[in-house]
Curated annotation (Swiss-Prot):
UniProt cross-references to InterPro entries, sorted A to Z: G-protein_beta_WD-40_rep, WD40/YVTN_repeat-like_dom_sf, WD40_repeat_dom_sf, WD40_rpt
Pfam families with a match to the protein in the record: WD40
Family: Belongs to the WD repeat BUB3 family.
Cross-link Glycyl lysine isopeptide (Lys-Gly) (interchain with G-Cter in ubiquitin) residue location(s): 216
Record protein name field: Mitotic checkpoint protein BUB3
Predominant location category: nucleus
Subcellular location, record wording: Nucleus; Chromosome, Centromere, Kinetochore
């Protein structure tokens, strides 16, 4: 299954994989959260697990604050900060319901968490302590940082754009342009917009500038759909990750495929081989050379027999990730 440009990590989590995140400054270290209640740190080139720490419930997301500190949250409502050098942990705070998302906002130096308790909380990582709680209209399903803005996707297909420097009001209230439940949002690196995916095999490319001439550029497309016995099977698009150098992005779906897209020319650049089961999470390394792919059954068809969960590390090339110059 794996070629010379790809390998599977040893000692994978023992249950579903919820999130994979590369260290901010190296493709050597990968943080992985899991339903087995663990957060694991892998040394990728050595293909070994460096460290593991536990929550008391499934961990739904994790993030690096800096190269030596991991943050994580999940079903136990607890937000933890773990020092990866000393193996010391700190219970930073809690939500009133499971924590679904954990993200670092480097431009304003805060951690943001989104929860099913219908709030986003900001945390000062230096102290560490709570720096504010902000009500959302519904359960938070996904969030993404765009410079000093925070884009929050909730139940009810709502999207809220917050200014992290002034959280006194919501900067923009939007509705998803897709008809079905939002699964993932990731911001463009140029801070001009975001990509949103749904459970119904679609992806939308949206722009933050509300002016009509910019809004004309937005579009949506179908993906992660397979014809089987002349019937189109439609799969959730669970994961999105941007390539830091080329501004292209990868999507992962419950069909087990990873696609890479050029949003500027509206083209698919490539599709990798089919992975054993659903793609639950994706992460490009900061330098864009490596893609971590979590192949992990997400119980779309209830508790049936399924392939074991695994993390694949793939070396990617410019041919796979760089936009093609449009024909003139």
């Amino acid at each position: 299954m794996t070629g010379s440009n790809e390998f599977k990590l040893n000692q994978p989590p023992e249950d579903g994989i919820s999130s994979v995140k590369f260290s901010p400054n190296t493709s050597q270290f990968l943080l992985v959260s899991s339903w087995d209640t663990s957060v694991r740190l892998y040394d990728v080139p050595a293909n070994s697990m460096r460290l593991k720490y536990q929550h008391t419930g499934a961990v739904l997301d994790c993030a690096f604050y800096d190269p030596t500190h991991a943050w994580s949250g999940g079903l136990d409502h607890q937000l933890k900060m773990h020092d990866l050098n000393t193996d010391q942990e700190n219970l930073v705070g809690t939500h009133d319901a499971p924590i679904r998302c954990v993200e670092y906002c480097p431009e304003v130096n805060v951690m943001a968490t989104g929860s099913w308790d219908q709030t986003v909380k900001l945390w000062d990582p230096r102290t560490p302590c709570n720096a504010g709680t902000f009500s959302q209209p519904e359960k938070v399903y996904t969030l993404s940082v765009s410079g000093d803005r925070l884009i929050v996707g909730t139940a009810g297909r709502r999207v809220l754009v917050w200014d992290l420097r002034n959280m006194g009001y919501v900067q923009q209230r939007r509705e998803s342009s897709l008809k079905y439940q939002t699964r993932c949002i990731r911001a463009f690196l140029n801070k001009q917009g975001y990509v949103l995916s749904s459970i119904e095999g679609r992806v939308a490319v949206e722009y933050l500038d509300p002016s009509p001439e910019v809004q004309k550029k937005k579009y949506a497309f179908k993906c992660h759909r397979l014809k089987e016995n002349n019937i189109e099977q439609i799969y959730p698009v669970n994961a999105i990750s941007f390539h830091n150098i080329h501004n292209t992005f990868a999507t992962g779906g419950s069909d087990g495929f990873v696609n890479i897209w050029d949003p500027f020319n509206k083209k698919r650049l490539c599709q990798f081989h089919r992975y054993p089961t659903s793609i639950a999470s994706l992460a490009f390394s900061n330098d864009g050379t490596t893609l971590a792919i979590a192949s992990s059954y997400m119980y779309e068809m209830d508790d049936t027999e399924h392939p074991e969960d695994g993390i694949f590390i793939r070396q990617v090339t410019d041919a796979e990730t760089k936009p093609k110059s449009p024909c003139t």
